[in-house]
Amino acid sequence: MTLRICRALAPLALVALLATAPAWGEDTVLHAQRLLDVRSGRLIEDAVVVVADGHIRAAGARSSIAAPAGARWIELGDRTLLPGLFDMHVHLSIGGPHHHKFTETLFDGPVDAALNGSENARLTLMAGFTTVRSAGDNDFIDVALKKAIERGIAVGPRIVPAGYQISMTGGHGDNTGWPPGVFETTPEQGVADGPEKLLRAVRYQIKHGAEVIKMMVSGGIGDIDRPIDILQFSDEEMRTVVDEARRNHVKVMAHSHSLESTLHAVRAGVDSIEHGSQLDDEAVRLMKERGTYLVPTPQLFEGDAYADYPEFMRAKMLEVQRRAGASLDLAVHAGVKIAFGTDAGTAPHGQNATQFALLVNHGMTPLAAIRAATLAAADLLGVADRGALDPGLLADVVAVPGNPLADVHALEHVDFVMKGGEIFRQPK
């Protein structure tokens, strides 16, 4: 299936890729009015980033850096240079500008979803997000997209794929609400009960390219005839998933909309809580104690992403909205580690950056919100080769008009994107 999907993606974006790729070995100097050092929080005026062989050679004030002779200069004017951004919760195969209604997905096959995912990946990169973590895509479409992008037959961000989401029978991730025998699922498709079958489910995802495991520990907004706040999986089952993933050097993200499920998942050792729409003092204390990240997805909860969805989904969304904002406020105030994630696919692809302002509305500073999408996200992924504009790191660089520390909405207007030294977007 993965090979068929990659072949289907092959014609896409080739012309754009050839048009934007620089000559190999050519040194490039990016020059802008400002550069944000996300580690120190300092804005450096009249700044340059020197790029060679896909990596950052130097970054800082122009006066302190000797540009290589013969380098190509890119003049970006009144803009701020930043590291490429991360979105830690995306579903590339669903959603998008032409594919957003719940009922449309019922009639799509995996190739339809993969082609849709290719366009969503392009939109995501053009918005300045050079790395994304998949929160699950059926048929290993996220794995196929990762391969297609790495091979140069599609344009998009660096993808950390998850494969199928891990769910209990009847849980969020299973197909609920249908007659017996319709849309039945297997451990290979992520639906499993008990340690033995969960081992099979986790190992199968990793075998076929998953680099993170997504575990559903509560109900979800899209579940038919199932409550959202039910605890899914026993403690033993959660520990089985976490232990097996960790044995394979793979991290675990846990979808959770209930307080009870969050507490159990954190105690089981997951690396991040996704959504976390119901938290209390005990939950934030435990998350701080264990070093568990929160990926809060306020873009999903505070927008109108579900306006065209069935009534049962809108009702659950209203339930989540009533408590999600206060939970995020509590987490920010308590100092829980937060990484940036939008649930793009339910929230719109390519509009990921609108979430920065929402995080600021919940008490984060603009710098803290940017760090959530750079340094913190890189830490959660466990990668040390990106997330800042440091010499030796991958040349993933974006630029925005103006100063994002003064106006966080500037991040919604990325107009320069470089990934691995290749320029994919430039100001007109």
Per-range role (PLM):
Residues 9-21:
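Bacterial N-terminal signal peptides
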Residues 35, 40-82:
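Histidine-rich, glycine-flanked metal-binding segment
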Residues 44, 373-375, 391-428:
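C-terminal cap of metal-dependent C-N hydrolases
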Residues 79-153, 169-174, 236, 260, ...:
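Metal-associated gating/positioning segment near the N- to mid-region
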Residues 96-99, 223-225, 262-268, 298-312, ...:
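Histidine/acidic-residue-rich catalytic or RNA/ligand-binding cores of hydrolases
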Residues 105, 247-251, 312, 320-403:
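His/Asp/Glu-enriched, well-ordered alpha-helical/loop segment
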Residues 116-142, 155-165, 210-223, 251, ...:
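Divalent metal-dependent hydrolysis catalytic cores, especially in the metallo-beta-lactamase
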Residues 147, 151-165, 229-254, 291, ...:
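Alpha-helix-loop-beta-strand connector modules within alpha/beta enzyme cores
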